[in-house]
Amino acid sequence: MKIFLLIGQLFGYLSLIVPRKVEYPLYLIRRAYITTRKRGLFKTFGNGSLLAPGVKLRTPAHVSIGKNSSIMSHCIIETCPTDKCTPHLKIGDNISLGEYSHITCADKVIIGNGVLTGRFVLITDNGHGKSTERDADIAPLARKIHSNGPVNIGDNVWIGDKATILPNVTIGKGCIIAANAVVTKDIPEYSVVAGVPAKIIKSLK
């Protein structure tokens, strides 16, 4: 374990001192190393998929990633097993999850093929407690994680920077979710949505 930490630190130090023209090849080497080291932690991990430096994983044994998908730097991928649910987080083929994005799953989150997200996107099917009067008297961190309904994102959806996909939502294929939108209900196929809460502003078909 120590040798892996030392190698990771070495790559980090080299990125600070090497010329810029060498920086990107060094990044590619580091990304390949991280992917090789961590791919076995997942339930399934497709050929050609990559994990960038800084990705944080929490109980990835419940996570399936398809082929040729990229999880960019500093993303958080987590599942939250509970006494009532075994999480099922499925990320499809040809996905690009933007930097600093966060996917958290207590029950079921399905992301279809060809989905692209910007940075700082949140996709969640859960929350701390059930938002009841009883829970209001308990510190949020002390409340049990509770799934509020599955999230299902169809193929070829484009999600802009800082958008939030809340629990119990289905987004149809081919949709565009504008930056900063908060999706609280189902979105039909080929819709463009924006706002808080997100509303349909255009249909693509």
Predicted segments, located by residue:
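Domain-scale signature associated with acetyltransferase and cell-envelope carbohydrate enzymes
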Residues: 1-125, 150-155, 165, 173, ...
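Nucleotide-sugar donor-binding/catalytic module of glycosyltransferases
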Residues: 170
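Short, flexible, mixed-charge acidic loops at enzyme active sites
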Residues: 129-139
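A short acidic, glycine-rich active-site loop
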Residues: 139-151
